[in-house]
Amino acid sequence: MMNSNLVPFDPYYKKRITYVWRGQQFAFDVAHTIFSSFQIDEGTDLLLRLIEPAFSEPQRILDVGCGCGVIGICLARRFPQADVTLVDKDLLAVRYARHNAELNATTNVTVLGSVGLSEAPPGPYDLIVSNIPAKIGDYAIEHEFILEPLRHLRPGGEYWFVVVSGLNHLIPRLGPRHNLRLKEIKKRAGHSVYRIIAPAATMPTGGL
């Protein structure tokens, strides 16, 4: 576990980014090769400013593809009663997300290395979030970042995610294709935020 005083000596360390969300100050140390290492990604910021889950006090939250941990750590601060799990396939991202959880005193965060959700604790989760990577291909996005997370939601749970506008050719088609309760929450230059609500009874399985 990295100590905040030692981070500048880490060979991958790039800089510390400050971020204000819901009136609270956060700090995130980032590495050279981690996604969005210059500033908080605009899609991440848009998602965080829009997310309002129906469960006012979610007990279990999952951040898929967490990067350095911005979304999950912010939600852990907002919902201190929740058990928040962050997963990423990049072990350097995992290392920095763990450090940033400590840096921001979010003791309710667990960070795990995981390809997709293979190592994530089993659901159900009340809330799942993701800034979906754009360059992994339509099939992987559909199956690994849309349908698979839905398997881990509790009935009535919510999946909030943001995508770059280049994926708007794909995401809206997935609603009718898999009978999903999919809604576009907001479109802003470069990004769109969506929400899927899991059915009250059976999880979607079409196409798997």
Task: For the regions a language model picked out, list residue spans one by one.
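Conserved SAM/SAH cofactor-binding pocket of Class I
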Residues: 43-121, 130
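Conserved proline-anchored active-site loop of SAM-dependent methyltransferases
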Residues: 64-68, 125-137, 149
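A short glycine-rich, Lys/Arg-flanked "PGG" loop and its adjoining helix->strand segment in the class I
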Residues: 143-155
